[in-house]
C-alpha cells in the first residue's frame, strides 16, 4: 500500500477553536490489512490494531521511542487527562510505541501514564500509516508540553539508557510519530504525521476534536472554561 500524502494542517497550542477534522485521509476507512496488524500489550499478548477502536472513537498517539525525552514529557501530560473526561465523551486514549513490550511497564511508571498503551516493535503500522523517518526541517512552534531543553533532555535520555536493564534506544531513534482519531470501526477522522520530534499535536487541540474537556497541564488536571 502506498503511503498516503502527509497532512500539513497544523493547530497552534494557543488555538481556542479548532475546525472539524479534515485532510486527505479523514473520512476514509483504514485498510483492513492495517487493522489486522498486531500490536503487543505489556504482557506480550498480540491484539489486532483495529480491535482497539472497533467499538468507539479513539485518540491514538504514536510516539517516537520510549527513551525520547520529548515523548516522555508529552506522555506525562497525556497521563494528566482524567479518565472521567474520556468516559464522558466515550473516547479511548491509546499510546503506541515501537520498542519491545518489556519497556511498557517501566515507561508507564516513569510517566504516570495509566491509559491504554501498546507497542508495534516491527514498526509495520508506522510504515503503513506513512509515519516519517528522519527529521524534516520545519517550524513547529513552542510546545506547551515540553519542559526540558535539548541539552538537559538528551542527558536524561542517555542516563536512562545506560542505567536501564538493557542498553538500547527502546525503538528506532529516527522514527517519527503522529496522532490519529479513529473509530468506531475502521473510520479515520483525523491524522497528523509528525515532521520532526517537536511536531506533535497540542493535546487540548486533539481533545477538542473529540469533544473531551480541556485540561490544564500547568498544574493538576482541571477544566478550562472558554
UniProtKB/Swiss-Prot annotation:
Function: May positively regulate ERK1/2 signaling and AKT1 activation leading to HIF1A up-regulation with an increased expression of glycolysis genes and enhanced glycolysis.
Tissue-level expression: Expressed in gastric tissues.
InterPro entries the record matches: PXL2A/B/C, Thioredoxin-like_sf
Encoding gene, per UniProt annotation: PRXL2C
Family membership: Belongs to the peroxiredoxin-like PRXL2 family. PRXL2C subfamily.
Coiled-coil ranges per UniProt: none
Protein name from the UniProt record: Peroxiredoxin-like 2C
GO biological process: positive regulation of ERK1 and ERK2 cascade; positive regulation of glycolytic process
Annotated source species: Homo sapiens (Human)
